[in-house]
Structure formats: structure tokens, C-alpha cells
Amino acid sequence: MKLATGLWVWGSLLVAARTVQPSASQSVCAGTENKLSSLSDLEQQYRALRKYYENCEVVMGNLEITSIEHNRDLSFLRSIREVTGYVLVALNQFRYLPLENLRIIRGTKLYEDRYALAIFLNYRKDGNFGLQELGLKNLTEILNGGVYVDQNKFLCYADTIHWQDIVRNPWPSNMTLVSTIGSSGCGRCHKSCTGRCWGPTENHCQTLTRTVCAEQCDGRCYGPYVSDCCHRECAGGCSGPKDTDCFACMNFNDSGACVTQCPQTFVYNPTTFQLEHNFNAKYTYGAFCVKKCPHNFVVDSSSCVRACPSSKMEVEENGIKMCKPCTDICPKACDGIGTGSLMSAQTVDSSNIDKFINCTKINGNLIFLVTGIHGDPYNAIDAIDPEKLNVFRTVREITGFLNIQTWPPNMTDFSVFSNLVTIGGRVLYSGLSLLILKQQGITSLQFQSLKEISAGNIYITDNSNLCYYHTINWTTLFSTVNQRIVIRDNRRAENCTAEGMVCNHLCSNDGCWGPGPDQCLSCRRFSRGKICIESCNLYDGEFREFENGSICVECDSQCEKMEDGLLTCHGPGPDNCTKCSHFKDGPNCVEKCPDVLQGANSFIFKYADQDRECHPCHPNCTQGCNGPTSHDCIYYPWTGHSTLPQHARTPLIAAGVIGGLFILVIMALTFAVYVRRKSIKKKRALRRFLETELVEPLTPSGTAPNQAQLRILKETELKRVKVLGSGAFGTVYKGIWVPEGETVKIPVAIKILNETTGPKANVEFMDEALIMASVDHPHLVRLLGVCLSPTIQLVTQLMPHGCLLEYVHEHKDNIGSQLLLNWCVQIAKGMMYLEERRLVHRDLAARNVLVKSPNHVKITDFGLARLLEGDEKEYNADGGKMPIKWMALECIHYRKFTHQSDVWSYGVTIWELMTFGGKPYDGIPTREIPDLLEKGERLPQPPICTIDVYIVMVKCWMIDADSRPKFKELAAEFSRMARDPQRYLVIQGDDRMKLPSPNDSKFFQNLLDEEDLEDMMDAEEYLVPQAFNIPPPIYTSRTRIDSNRSEIGHSPPPAYTPMSGSQFVYQDGGFATQQGMPMPYTATTSTIPEAPVAQGATAEMFDDSCCNGTLRKPVVPHVQEDSSTQRYSADPTVFAPERNPRAELDEEGYMTPMHDKPKQEYLNPVEENPFVSRRKNGDLQALDNPEYHSASSGPPKAEDEYVNEPLYLNTFTNALGNAEYMKNSLLSVPEKAKKAFDNPDYWNHSLPPRSTLQHPDYLQEYSTKYFYKQNGRIRPIVAENPEYLSEFSLKPGTMLPPPPYRHRNTVV
């Protein structure tokens, strides 16, 4: 908390905080907690420092030395031997720090919650003055906290000190030391110092007391031998082996001896087996044992404490303030500002003032600042309603200090503290317990009940309208002679007197707090309550009083008011009445004579005589009497006797017994009926269950059944070819699947569990199979089957191009903006599908995204994925290794995984793509990632990304999971960007980039080296169901832009090809495929033998994720060959004839059925079968043809008409700058065949209508309506991945790299 500048103009404030001398040899003084705050007057700053610490040996708190000039005498600091808090030396200009006798810094409080010793910025920027030597030659122990020495321009020798010998726990995270070698004027240590010293002479050598000790020593030592070990209670070294030879104590100092605990109040006597009072008991006060606690502390058991706990109340016994358990409800004690529940609060404000309702005691401080009274817009805190300040009218004690720097302008006094009796000063603010500063509207203080300020000084200044302050005798409030007063720059006393603002004439010379007889510190004559009066009502008045010294006390209510001139009472209580109002029982006046009193052997009854005095009845009277004899006893009217005869008592007793038995019977019957009814309910419920009368499930969850199919493969159908990877739990092979009874060969990845793994690994293996078999989406890998051999085998489709991380790294010079954004959309759609299926992936990263083709990626690696139940919203992991750098903060701290935590991983994955395979947080140890994220650091903006793309990443990395976007929103956002890619990603030469042939991939080449793949068939191609054969239709090209559209000067944005959905209709034969129904193909072959033809093109032509294109002349059906040619068409680009020949462009440049116009050629690219790329005869293939990478500028040659050329994104440069727009001269298509592409049903699979694109819900439709068979991939297991880290490895102590991932100071 910083004070205003005006506060620090102290004048002659001399602070003496010395409070107690625990022993004859050591004096204790209070520390400060000002940090870098200082007085505006440097002279006063020095004088305050000197008064604080002169002749002080133990600083109970922090030692802060700041803003001291170079010519000041600091020799008074030599007396300090111990500091319980931290030592701060900053912003000074002196040359030498004379803390020569300081031996131990306990570090009970740390500077910036980290350092016990902080020394920095001790030099003058425009001069040659500054700290040169640390005179800490006897400092040998820092019990808690680290050392920070930095930016001391002239400081020497600090880098030679062996700080690890001084610091008890020298963790790298709290040790910071900047080298001072090379500073001007620095010399070397004396030769006897062995290179470690505080100064240049032999008297400045560092004394090592820990690192030089024998191994048998469990603490410090005074020599290298076993016999030189210090006592285990010693701290900072010793001069001998005894507990009285310690330089400082580890725990407590009991009259010079270091002990584990102070002598207790009670000790056990083994002879009497009893706890007996210990006459040598002492109280613990800090690190000392004292016979008496300081006057402003409270005794709790055997300790000196600042405040009693909530279950106890503060009482005073024999002049000692003690904490005693409350007999009933404790008086309400509330936490003050800066303590307990208000630890982080800086001022009383509208957000916390209600916590002070009905409080009688404040354990801590009350602080009123401008941000509390007038509000804090920055923190959205409203101004305080002045009426709410009345909650402090119940406060009687403040154990800390009262600091008022701002007050409501419409309040002219502090009357809300009218019941405040004591300001304890157990915590001081720069030595102050009462501070009132710059309150221009205050005219009087009105602390009318204040009787004591136990400790600390008073500072009241710059209150221009304040009066009455000069009349107060402040010393009557002080408990010690060392307390001081600074009161100045308030309203002049003569001006107050001139306006009549003076004390009431009934006030004594001690002064007053304000106008009126109720504001006096003491009364000149008499007082009634808080009001001073001239005389008591002894002989007249509405109510009568008696004098108790100078206090008028009202007579007891049983005293009869006497006539004027006569005393009604002469003391307190009903026994001092002159005459009773009602009756007199012995010496006391009572309202009536007592009916019954407990005597020694019987009850006693009394009656009143004619003088209204009470007397006892005759002993035979058992129910009262009217006189002294037995005949005056009270009789029962029906017997005529004073007591009831025996025969009259019998019926009453009998009636009572009968009534009691009747009640018992009723209760027993009621209980029996209750038990019977409960038993009948149970039987009926069981009968209904056995008779199947239940119409609803016992535990309805609302979750749909998982109807995914699991294919069981025989071991004879699988052939292993090559090991692709292995780990702790299994091995991944490249293999071939030959379905039983078929002639096709399908390349697959086979994941085999090791034989040495246990049952738990088998269960986890099958859990992964469950997840993979449950997904069915174009951008998610799906399980092909499971082989239940002795070692379980998972079979997935083999991905020809490896993982996306390696792919972008290998081809980073040839990847354009369109392709990057397409990948972002595909990954988002895949994750959106997982979210709809309540699957949490937990391990999304670029390494876990596979490349089926350059334009089609799939998410894989479900080894960490978990399926949430119907009522679950999050998954709690129990252990294992985790990819920390890809995980959200809640996953790292609490191991809670949700779909929103997958969004965080998605943002990191996109960052990897945009940096072409960059490593997130490269160079930073994984265990330090949580701290960096909590401090607000995130991955930097990739160079190619505009702010639009980067802001999407940043939204994915919000700390609040609910603030992150949904995958649905991410897919919509990146779809929008993909329609205009060069606006959002800036890549040099983007429009000229040509993605290399898929066959050029290193991963792909490695797969082809060891097996003849001519007869291979892609797994998805094999899994497409064969319903019937359809004649191969003749396809036509689609017109993208007509000439009329170009004439109006509107150029449509580049289009993004959507990745889901397909719908096209054949007009031949009446066969049609609708959405969600895969289209079978008829096998065809070329009639020109010279033309190389790509075989086995997949059905991905109708998958929305395809972006490659092929163009080929129509061919005729061929005879049946093997099972693969019987199942599919070799050319998937053969489309149905047009359905509607009339079409025109919509606003986005897409076709809508309208009318015929001349059109340019538009191609929807499709994928090639990645495994059919070479022929045995060595003919030139389409993918090996140089023409693959560029388009011809003229008409195609006749011999090239049948060449299959994939069209990759960003490989054509035309006027539109879009890979999907091709020049007229590129390909020639017969005019009669151009209308097929105008069929709206054909284009429905490519892109939804514009109205749908502009609505984010279109992603729901296009991501969940269609289901496809998926492939597999290969990855190293988690145990071998360096990006995964066990939660037990997250420990502090790792080096931080340079910025931007660390703070300014380095760690050593």
C-alpha cells in the first residue's frame, strides 16, 4: 500500500518502535513494510531509519533501507544481528552497507513473495555514487527465500560469494545473481579468502558453515571435523557444540540457549501423574521466549499473538490480556483490511463493507482510500453509500491501525467511530496507528469513546477545516512514552476560537473531540454515561442518582423515589435504597416476597407483614402462608387441611400411572402401523418388478446405443511387410490385407500389442479399438478390423503420406494459403464430429493428423480419446503422460478434459501448420509451461498469418474454457477464410506455388520400395458397397464464370471446396444416388495403349474433402477382370449427364439453375489412388509426367487427351489467381458435354447454397449427414514422445530461456 506524497512530509516524526527486550543482551524493534516507498524529504527518510534501528539487535519484521544518500552515516546498523522478515536494500547511493553483525535472515516474509535478500538499483544514474561493498561478512544463514542482487553499477565481490552455503534451500527458482565482474575499481579477494569474500581485505573473507562440514553434521559447523558440528538447534553457525554456543537459533532463544520450544505453562509430573503449573513458563514471541508479552499483544495459551482466534474472546485478567474460550456466542470479531478473508483488499469499499456489519472488534486494520470511497472504475467497484459507513458504529476495538485518506464530502466528522475505545497498534503503517490526511471537509474528529492508543504514532495533517485537535491531551491515550504525535497544517486554533468552535465548559483541560458536552475526553465535574454534567440528581430530578466518584449512577429500580431534599439511594444495587418501592427481603428491596426458597432440608415460603417486610412461614406450611403461625398456612378448599391426606393422594397417583400407560400403548401401536405400511410398500414394489410391470428402464440415460460394427479378421488374411515403429506397448507394421475369398490386396497398418504386456494394456488396447470403430467421418481414421490372435492386432488403413507435421515441414516451400486453410477446415470438421459424438480426443496435434492426399487429411490417434457418458460434461484422467505443450491449463492443473480443452489443442495444431512444422514453446522445459500460461504468455503470431487468423488462435487459448469458440464456429470461420485465402495468409509467391507430386514424399517412397503395389486397392475403395452396375455416363465440365458476368467488373472470390456431402443423379437407367449413399462404379479401361491410365481411382471424387482433379476422355466398359475391377470404375470423374441445362452464377460465383450462357471450364478436383503410381513395363505415369506441374497454354495435343493429370491447389496462374479456375486453352471439352456440370445436383456435393454457408448451422448438416469408411495411420507411442510429460515431473527448478518466455532476471 502506497501513501500519498504528502504523507511523507513528516516534519519531526521520530519513530521508536522498540517494544520489548526478550533477554538482557538483545533488544527488539519492529520492522517496516514500505517496500520501495520513501519520504519525499530524504533528510526525514534518513532520520526515520535511524530512529527505527539505532541500538536494535533483532528486527521483528522487515529491514528496508531505501533512498539513502551517499553522505549518510549508517554505522548504527552495525548493532543488527537478526532479521525475521526480509532485507531490502534499493535505490541508495551510499558506498558501504555496514550490516557487519547480521548473522541470520529468517525470511518469514519475502520480498515479492520470493526473496529474503534483495539488493538492486543502488547507484546514481547521473553520478559516481553507488553501493560498492556489502558489509555482510557475518551473514551465514537465510532460513527461507532466495537472494536477488542486480543492477548495482559499482558493486564488487558479490559474485564471489558462495550463496548456496548461506541459503538453506537454494532452489534455482529463487536464486538470482547478476555478475559484477568488470565493474570499474573492483579488485580481487585477498589470497587467504580462496576466492570468496565480501571485500578486499583478509577480514572480509566469507565464512563457510555448511558446505565444508563433515557428512555426519546435520546442520552447521565451526570446523571440518566430526567434532566441530554445531548443535542441531543452531542457525547461522556456532562457536562450539553446545546449544548456548549458537550465533542464532533455529527455533527459539531461551535466555541465550537455543531450544525447540519455550518452557510450557504446564508440565507433567511423573510422580503424581498430573499436569502441574510451571513457574518457569515463558511465552513464545517471535523467535524468543519471554516472561511477559508486549502490552499490545494478547496471550493465547503459551504464545503472544496479535489477535484471538474466532472461537475465543479477548479478556483481561490480572492486567494481562488473554484469549479465553467463549461461554456462549463470541462477540463478533471481523477481519480487517489486509488480513484473513480481506487479505487482498487495499481499502474499505462497496464490495466488502457489508462484511463489517455488527462487528465489535476488527482484527487488523481499517483503511479508507479514494478508490474505496469514490469507487474504482478500473475494477468495476462503485462508490460507497455514505449511509453504509454507519456499520462501524458497533466497532469498539481495532487491533491494527486506522488510516483515513479519503472521506465522503458530505460528512464533516468521524462520528461513525463514536464507540471506538481502543486502537491496538499491533500492526503499524510506517510506525503509525492513527493517520488522518487531507480531509478538507472534516471539522471535528468526534472519537468520543476513544480511551487508548496502545502502540504507534499519530499523524494528522493537511485538514484545512479541522478544529478541536489542539485541545486534546494525546498523552492520556498513549500506553508507552515512546509514542509520538505529528499534528500540523490544520485549521489555526485562533480561527476556530473566533468562530466559537471550542470545547464545552463542562470539559476538563484534557480537551474535546468536538462541540457539546458529550465530546469531552474527561469531565470537569461529573459525567452521566458519555455526557459531562454539572451535578448528579441526588435530591431531585425525574430519576435519582448517587455519586460514584465523578460518575453519576442511577439508583436501582427497586428504590422508592424520595421527596425532594432526601437521598433515594446511597450506592449501587437494591441493598442501598433508602426506602423500597415494593417489599424488603432482608437488606434487599424486591418486587414481591419469594414464593419458595430451597432450605437445608425443605422448601421455605415467605409472607409480607404490614410494613411490607418479608418473613418466613411456619415450618408446617408446605404451600405458603399468610402469617407467622401454623394456622396461617394456605389450605386446600376441599379438605380443609394445609396438606393433602394420604388417601387423597392415591387416586391422583393411579390416574397418572394409567394415563402414562395409555400414552405408551398409543405410541407402540403407531410405530407398529408405520413399520407395517413400510413393509407392504416394499413387497408391492418387488411384486411389480417380478411381474415385469415396470414400463421404464431403471436407469434411463438418454444416450443412443452405439451400433458401430467391428470386423474380426483372421491372422491368415494379414501379411506383415515392414516395421514402421515400435514402443513400450506394441509395434506398428506396414502390411497387406487380402480378404478371404478375394484377389484384392489392401495396404494396411497393423498395430500389434507386445506379448510381455499385461491385462491392463490389453484392456486399453481394446478401448482404443472401441473408439476408432465408433467414428465414421471423412476426416477421422476408422478401424478396419481387429485380429484376435495371441497378440491382439488393430488393422487400419495405411496412410501413404505420413503425418501432416512432417508433410508440411518437407513441402513448406510449395504449400499455399488455400491448402493451409482447407486443412484447418477439415480438422475442425473432424473435431466437430467428435464433439457431436461426445468424444474427447485429448491428444490433438499436427503429428496426429494424417495425409491421405495433399488435399485430404484425417485425424487419428485415439489412444487417449475418451467417450463421455450421457450425463458427463468432462473427463477426469487419473495419471499417465500428457502432451503438456498442446494442453489447456485446466487439463494440466486438474486433469479435466472437455471438448473445449480440445479447442485449445486445435489452436496449437493450427499454429504448427502456419509455422510449417514449428515446435510450440521451443526450448522451454515442459514443466515450466503452466507458469508461463498463467502469466499470460501464448505462442507468437506466425509470420504468414494476418491478425484475423491469429485472433482465432488466441481465442482458442483463453483461460476460461467457456470463452473459447466451438468447433462449429471454427469450421465456419475457416470456411469463410478459405474462400479468399490470400486475404488471410500472406505467403510470398503464393499464386505460383506448385505442390509436388504425392509420390515425391519421402514417406511414400519408403512404402513403395519394398512391395509391388500395382495390384493394390485402397481400403475405402474396397469397403464401398456394390449394389448394382451403372453404365459409365459421359461427363461434362462445369462453367464457373460467364462472359456477361465478367463484363460488369465483378470478380468473385476464390472458392473453397467444401469437404462433406455428395449428391448427383444419373439420367440413364433411372438409377440415382442421394445424399449419404456411396456411388458404385463400373470398371473401365483405356482403348489407347500408349496413354498411361491411373488405375483404381477412389470414390473420393464425391467426398467433399477432395481437392485433386483428373480429366479424362469418356471410355467404354471393359470386360470383367478381377474382384477389384468388378467392383469399381477406373475413372471416378465420369459423371452423369446434365439434369438442368439452365444455370447462372449466384453472388459468390457458384452456379444456380437458370439459363444457358457461354462458360469457362471449372473443374472439381478429385483424388488419385495413392498406391497405383507405377507400372511394371516402366511406362511414364501421369504423376511422373513433367506436364503434371504446369498447364499448357495452348490446345491439348491429341496424344495427351487421355493423360490423367491431378490438379493441385495453387498450381495454376490465371487471371483469377485461383487454382480452381482454369484457362479456356487448358482443356477442350465438346460443347455438347458442357451441360453436365450445370446440373445443380452435381454441384450439391461440392458446396452448400450460399445462404447455408452464411449460416453457421450449415456445418452441422454437412458434417454429420454422411458417413464414410476411414483409414488408419502410424505414430510412435506416448512413452517415446518427448512432447508428453508425466504430471509427477512438473516440479520447479528448471532454467528459463531468454525473452519472451521469461522475466527480465535470469535464474542461476
Curated annotation (Swiss-Prot):
Membrane-spanning segments: 652-675
Disulfide bonds listed in the record: C29-C56, C156-C186, C189-C197, C193-C205, C213-C221, C217-C229, C230-C238, C234-C246, C249-C258, C262-C289, C293-C304, C308-C323, C326-C330, C503-C512, C507-C520, C523-C532, C536-C552, C555-C569, C559-C577, C580-C589, C593-C614, C617-C625, C621-C633
PPxy motif 1 (motif): residue ranges: 1032-1035
Coiled coil: none
Motif window: PPxY motif 2: 1298-1301
Origin: domain of life: Eukaryota
Domain Protein kinase: 718-985
PTM summary: Isoform JM-A CYT-2 and isoform JM-A CYT-1 are processed by ADAM17. Proteolytic processing in response to ligand or 12-O-tetradecanoylphorbol-13-acetate stimulation results in the production of 120 kDa soluble receptor forms and intermediate membrane-anchored 80 kDa fragments, which are further processed by a presenilin-dependent gamma-secretase to release the respective cytoplasmic intracellular domain E4ICD (either E4ICD1/s80Cyt1 or E4ICD2/s80Cyt2). Autophosphorylated on tyrosine residues in response to ligand binding. Autophosphorylation occurs in trans, i.e. one subunit of the dimeric receptor phosphorylates tyrosine residues on the other subunit. Ligands trigger phosphorylation at specific tyrosine residues, thereby creating binding sites for scaffold proteins and effectors. Constitutively phosphorylated at a basal level when overexpressed in heterologous systems; ligand binding leads to increased phosphorylation. Phosphorylation at Tyr-1035 is important for interaction with STAT1.
The protein's Enzyme Commission number: 2.7.10.1
Residues of this chain annotated as glycosylated in UniProt: N138, N174, N253, N358, N410, N473, N495, N548, N576, N620
Signal peptide, first to last residue: 1-25
Keyword terms: Activator, Apoptosis, ATP-binding, Cell membrane, Developmental protein, Disulfide bond, Glycoprotein, Kinase, Lactation, Membrane, Mitochondrion, Nucleotide-binding, Nucleus, Phosphoprotein, Receptor, Repeat, Signal, Transcription, Transcription regulation, Transferase, Transmembrane, Transmembrane helix, Tyrosine-protein kinase, Ubl conjugation
Pfam families with a match to the protein in the record: Furin-like, GF_recep_IV, PK_Tyr_Ser-Thr, Recep_L_domain, TM_ErbB1
InterPro entries on file: Furin-like_Cys-rich_dom, Furin_repeat, GF_recep_IV, Growth_fac_rcpt_cys_sf, Kinase-like_dom_sf, Prot_kinase_dom, Protein_kinase_ATP_BS, Rcpt_L-dom
Subcellular location(s) of the protein: Cell membrane
Binding site for ATP: 724-732, 751, 797-799, 843-848
All ranges on the Extracellular side of the membrane: 26-651
Family assignment from sequence similarity: Belongs to the protein kinase superfamily. Tyr protein kinase family. EGF receptor subfamily.
Subunit and partners: Monomer in the absence of bound ligand. Homodimer or heterodimer with another ERBB family member upon ligand binding, thus forming heterotetramers. Interacts with EGFR and ERBB2. Interacts with DLG2 (via its PDZ domain), DLG3 (via its PDZ domain), DLG4 (via its PDZ domain) and SNTB2 (via its PDZ domain). Interacts with MUC1. Interacts (via its PPxy motifs) with WWOX. Interacts (via the PPxY motif 3 of isoform JM-A CYT-2) with YAP1 (via the WW domain 1 of isoform 1). Interacts (isoform JM-A CYT-1 and isoform JM-B CYT-1) with WWP1. Interacts (via its intracellular domain) with TRIM28.
Protein name, per record: Receptor tyrosine-protein kinase erbB-4
Species of the source: Rattus norvegicus (Rat)
